[in-house]
C-alpha cells in the first residue's frame, strides 16, 4: 500500500500542497466527462490545496489528450501523465479520484479512498456522483469527511474484496488457470462495434495463420 508514499510526499512538498487528486476518465466518447470537466478542474485547483494529476486511457481521442496536455502546461499544480503509463502507480499516490464511468473507479475504492464521478451510469453507486460539474469542489469537500461516504467505501472493501494480504492477483490467476483447465479458451469474444474498432485500431487484425 505504501510503495509510492515517498514519491507522493516529495511531489506534495515540491508543490507545497496537501493532497493529490487523480482525474482518470473513460475513453468512451458517449460516456467520457472530458468535454465538460476542464473549467471545474481549474476551479478546484484554484480553490483547494491540491496537486492534480491527469491520466487518460490509451484509447482516448488524441484531440482530448492534446487539449488537456496544453491546459495542464498552463497550470502550475497540474501534471499531465502520458497515456502509455500504467494508472496503478498514480492511483496508489492519489488521495481522491475523479472519473465518470471508468472501471478504475472500483480499483480505487478498494484502496478505501474517495471517488467523485460525473454522470456515472452504474446501477449501484457507492461514491459521490454529480450531474453538474459546478458541484465538483463541493463534492470534493464532502467525500473527505462525510461519514456516510466513508461508510460506503468501507462496505465496498468488505463485500467486494476483503483480502488485504497482497495476494489477490495470485488468487485471481489461480482461478483463471483453473477455469481454462476445466472449460478451455473461448474461440471468439463477443465485442460491440466500438470495442472491435478500438482493438483493431490499437493492435491490428490477427491473421488466421497466427491464431492458436
Question: Model-derived features: where do they sit?
Answer:
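C-terminal "capping" alpha-helix adjacent to the active site of nucleotide-linked donor transferases
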Residues: 131-148
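Catalytic cores of nucleotide-enabled group-transfer and carboxylate-activating enzymes in metabolic
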Residues: 7-9, 20, 99, 106-107, ...
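C-terminal amphipathic helix plus adjacent low-complexity
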Residues: 144-212
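Nucleotide-activated donor-binding/catalytic signature segment of Leloir-type glycosyltransferases, i.e.
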Residues: 66-83
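Conserved catalytic-core segment of nucleotide-activated headgroup transferases in glycan assembly
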Residues: 1-70, 164, 169-170
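A donor-sugar binding/catalytic signature common to diverse glycosyltransferases
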Residues: 84-127
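Short, solvent-exposed loop/turn segments at secondary-structure junctions
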Residues: 26-30, 58-61, 103-104, 121-123, ...
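Short, conserved active-site loop motifs that form the nucleotide-linked donor/cofactor pocket
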Residues: 50, 77-79, 127-128
